[in-house]
Amino acid sequence: KSVRVHHVSLQGYLEGNPSNKTRLSQLKEAVNACVSRYQNAGRTVRLQGQWPDYLVGSREDIYYGENRRIRYTTVIAYVLNPADCSLMENISRTADLVSGGGTCNVDLASKTAKGYCPTDGHASSPANTNRRGPAFGDDEGLKQLARDPRMAAAVASIQKTIASSNATSGQKRSVLGLECEVWDQPAAPGGGSACYTKKGSFVPSRVTGQGAEVGMLLDFDSKYGFKMKAVSAKLDNNVSPAVFAPYNMPGFTVSARMATEK
């Protein structure tokens, strides 16, 4: 039986501080210096042809169900290959499954998964569509930390940041023809914003219990962090239930669920 989802594909890059442009220029200088040294020493080099636009690029595919969400992330980072002065790709492929039942973190490259990873891919987790999550200040872990006078100020700062990140800016934009609501993201590196659409037959809500924004992410912009923009968005699309449980594939090792991870 298929599962009804909203599916968005986003592409972007890490701006960073120093900026992507500055760090890319620094890498080019390091490559040129490496080539010069190796050629003078008579060593073999592999000259770089086309250069990437971004030092760290990312692609995300997010599938929103009515009671769960899974995000597939691929990150490609370019570094100097000391063997021949070429560029080397460091690629990570991960997925995180989240619902009211807990979180499962999946490393697609090493075929490992940890956390709350039931075989049904959180299909039986309680639905909380269109419901605002519990206030962050109700978190028991924070309450315990706040009892320590040395941590009280830090906890208050965390609560203030999270509370402000839950506030909409009141602005609206259009991405891929879909109207979305802009939310401030002060906790993002350097601050930022995210735009969520509430279009479709259901409105997915953030299910971590740490945020009130609802909808499908179409745009995320952080001053020093990642800048992601939707390149494809499909509402009310039917997919296989296997999308929510990649760790059920042969060869995966799933760790025992820890109570603290639920």
Task: Report residues per predicted region.
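Extended soluble regions of mature proteins
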Residues: 1-262
